[in-house]
């Protein structure tokens, strides 16, 4: 939906549940959700919160060691930020009451053996996809941006694909895997690619072609249903939105807000190009995957792939060019100054991956990384 021409944006964040003393993951999702329901932190958007109305909801995910929050749709970044802060606070309170801590990291730094949530759909996923499902303790941040029609959605999807790797780099927050440095800034991206429907796509051209591809993936068993269409960007099967799914869950609320602002501007810019009849960029899925791999590997610390020019460029240069490209839409929503400040802050303090590695480097202890993540998850959400 839109309000006075401004597209709404909503954010889903997935979190790991950890023992704050032993620093290991805990299969506590059901206890956390039970406490959340008791305190008004679960259920549909708009549930009661001790400090006001909780602007969103909490839910279970594939594994018992994680929970997911979902904000209500907003037109203003301030409103969205307030929603995300409230949800993190509510989830952290519920987690603490259940004896665990909330951790905004896209992979758990310590060794883990996740367990599947006992729901028929998730148990079927385990049976159909084996180790891919059993090891899938990863946490993403998904952004829903309102669209006016399915035609506009596909037109925008086809045109925004070359810029998605920039969002991967900016949100990288998963350098550790099973207790060791993975060598990647976003190792979640690599783990996620195991799913047969995950990753970059070619251009679809029309809703009919999009539907044909989705139907074929389901009929061949690559996906059990629409919910397992794990494209980098997909048409939501619940809401009139495009859902951008490339990002790690962000360590801080500020980074989540920056992601949402850029995602909305990206969709709006691509939709404007579609409406104007501008051609779809001729970029092969293989090159989209290569750009995503490099963003996953280095974050914003090295060079990224400039798909338009076909060369490697410094990460900051490509980020600045991306922000300039979506600049008219940022100006239209009044977000230009806020985004500029958030980008500067991101490069000044580093991505979540940079901060996790810095915590480890001080003493060489993975427990310090977990402590940092727990602290940073709720620092911006403090009353």
Curated annotation (Swiss-Prot):
SUPFAM superfamilies tied to this protein: Glutamine synthetase/guanido kinase (SSF55931)
NCBIfam families: gshA_cyan_rel, PRK13517.1-1
Domain of life from the UniProt record: Bacteria
Organism: Frankia alni (strain DSM 45986 / CECT 9034 / ACN14a)
Chain's role: ATP-dependent carboxylate-amine ligase which exhibits weak glutamate--cysteine ligase activity.
GO molecular function, one term: glutamate-cysteine ligase activity
EC number(s) recorded for this UniProt protein: 6.3.2.2
Keywords noted in UniProt: ATP-binding, Ligase, Nucleotide-binding
Annotated region (Disordered), positions in chain: 35-56
A biological process term (GO) from this entry: modified amino acid biosynthetic process
Keyword Ligase: yes
Reactions catalysed: L-cysteine + L-glutamate + ATP = gamma-L-glutamyl-L-cysteine + ADP + phosphate + H(+)
Protein name: Putative glutamate--cysteine ligase 2-2
Group of enzyme by EC: ligase
Family: Belongs to the glutamate--cysteine ligase type 2 family. YbdK subfamily.
PANTHER family, sorted: GLUTAMATE--CYSTEINE LIGASE 2-RELATED
């Amino acid at each position: 939906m839109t309000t006075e021409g401004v597209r709404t944006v909503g954010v889903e964040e997935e979190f790991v549940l950890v023992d704050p003393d032993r620093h290991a993951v805990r299969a506590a999702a059901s206890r956390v959700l039970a406490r959340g329901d008791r305190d008004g932190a679960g259920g549909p958007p708009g549930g009661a919160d001790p400090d006001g109305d909780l602007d969103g909801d909490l839910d279970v995910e594939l594994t018992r060691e994680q929970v997911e929050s979902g904000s209500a749709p907003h037109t203003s970044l301030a409103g969205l930020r307030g929603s995300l802060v409230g949800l993190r606070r509510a989830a952290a309170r519920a987690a603490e009451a259940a004896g665990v801590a909330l951790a905004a990291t896209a992979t758990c730094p310590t060794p883990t053996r996740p367990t599947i949530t006992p729901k028929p759909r998730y148990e079927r996923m385990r049976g159909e996809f084996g180790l891919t499902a059993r090891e899938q303790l990863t946490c993403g941040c998904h952004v829903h941006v309102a669209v006016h029609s399915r035609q506009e959605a596909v037109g925008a999807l086809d045109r925004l694909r070359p810029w998605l790797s920039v969002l991967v780099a900016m949100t990288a927050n998963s350098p550790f895997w099973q207790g060791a440095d993975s060598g990647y800034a976003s190792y979640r991206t690599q783990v996620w690619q195991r799913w047969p429907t995950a990753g970059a796509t070619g251009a679809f051209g029309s809703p009919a072609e999009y539907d044909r591809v989705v139907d074929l993936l389901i009929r061949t068993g690559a996906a059990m249903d629409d919910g397992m269409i794990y494209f980098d960007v997909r048409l939501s099967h619940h809401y009139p939105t495009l859902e951008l799914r490339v990002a790690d869950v962000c360590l801080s609320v500020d980074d989540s807000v920056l992601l949402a602002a850029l995602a909305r501007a990206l969709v709006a810019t691509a939709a404007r190009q579609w409406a104007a009849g501008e051609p779809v960029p001729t970029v092969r899925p293989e090159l989209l995957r290569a750009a995503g791999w490099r963003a996953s590997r280095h974050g914003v610390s090295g060079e990224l792939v400039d798909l338009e020019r076909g060369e490697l460029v410094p990460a900051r240069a490509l980020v600045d060019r991306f922000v300039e490209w979506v600049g008219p839409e940022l100006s239209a929503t009044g977000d230009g100054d806020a985004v500029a400040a958030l980008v500067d802050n991101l490069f000044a303090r580093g991505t979540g991956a940079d901060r996790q590695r810095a915590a480890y480097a001080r003493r060489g202890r993975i427990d310090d990384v977990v402590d940092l993540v727990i602290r940073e998850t709720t620092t911006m959400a403090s009353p």
